[in-house]
């Protein structure tokens, strides 16, 4: 049967390529920011939840040459695209795909790090494309269930990183704290200095610490800010 869904545009980075296939989710600035910001240099094992095309897993594999990475997704089209992207990357031997629901999957290990670009639309009109709907709406994975599952999957000193729109991110942090998490780091992302915070990069830990709060402005003076370039230059071709 012919696939009637449109293909997602491919995207090339400095050390790997993302072929979107029919995954329904193109490469986003959100994902790139999270993959560049999360501090996973001490992690030996990492789980990418809802990997989609595999962007976060690939960025983490590039950044940490010793980390073994599992990437899980429930969507067949996403898994097909991620498999192609993992196989064509320089780090295929350290990348494994898991098919299934993260809430019920029988994981055989705990993880030093978890990264996730979670669904965030809790209500309103659903995305027209079913793959995009699953990726963007909390239809199949509530934030509470996600946080509880991540808490159980982390190793004793593990950390988890997420990216969410500002309003949803504040609620996510509050919910996390009621479930026993502690905020370890937060980056407030602004498109420009004159625009409000649009995204939150969130670092959570099972142990209390002084949270590092920082800001990132993406564009300044009709170009990218020095901070944005410094954060993403290892990945973007034209940085």
Question: Which positions does each model-derived feature cover?
Answer:
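SAM-dependent Rossmann-like transferase core, predominantly class I methyltransferases
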Residues: 3-45, 51-53, 58-62, 200-203, ...
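Mobile active-site "lid"/loop adjacent to the S-adenosyl-L-methionine
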Residues: 118-145, 149
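Conserved SAM/SAH cofactor-binding pocket of Class I
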Residues: 36-108, 113-116, 122-127
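Conserved beta-strand segments of alpha/beta enzyme cores
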Residues: 17, 68, 94-96, 182-185
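SAM/dcSAM-binding transferase cores
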Residues: 195-239
């Amino acid at each position: 049967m012919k696939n009637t869904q449109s293909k997602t545009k491919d995207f090339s980075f400095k050390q790997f390529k993302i072929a979107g296939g029919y995954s329904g989710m193109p490469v986003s600035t959100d994902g790139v920011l999270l993959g560049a910001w999360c501090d996973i240099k001490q992690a030996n094992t990492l789980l990418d939840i809802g990997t989609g095309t595999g962007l976060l897993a690939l960025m983490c594999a590039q950044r940490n040459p010793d980390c073994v990475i599992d990437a899980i997704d429930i969507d067949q089209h996403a898994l097909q695209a991620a498999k192609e992207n993992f196989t064509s990357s320089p780090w295929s031997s350290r990348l494994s795909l898991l098919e299934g629901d993260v809430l019920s999957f029988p994981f055989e290990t705990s993880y030093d790090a978890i990264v996730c670009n979670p669904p965030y639309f809790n209500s309103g009109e659903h995305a027209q494309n079913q793959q995009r709907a699953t990726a963007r709406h909390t239809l199949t994975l509530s934030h509470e269930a996600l946080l509880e599952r991540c808490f159980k999957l982390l190793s004793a000193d593990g950390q988890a990183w997420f990216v969410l729109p500002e309003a949803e991110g504040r609620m996510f942090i509050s919910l996390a704290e009621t479930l026993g998490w502690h905020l370890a780091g937060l980056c407030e992302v602004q498109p420009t200095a004159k625009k409000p915070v649009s995204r939150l990069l969130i670092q959570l830990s099972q142990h209390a610490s002084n949270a590092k709060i920082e800001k990132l402005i993406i564009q300044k003076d009709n170009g990218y800010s020095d901070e944005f370039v410094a954060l993403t230059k290892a990945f973007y071709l034209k940085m």
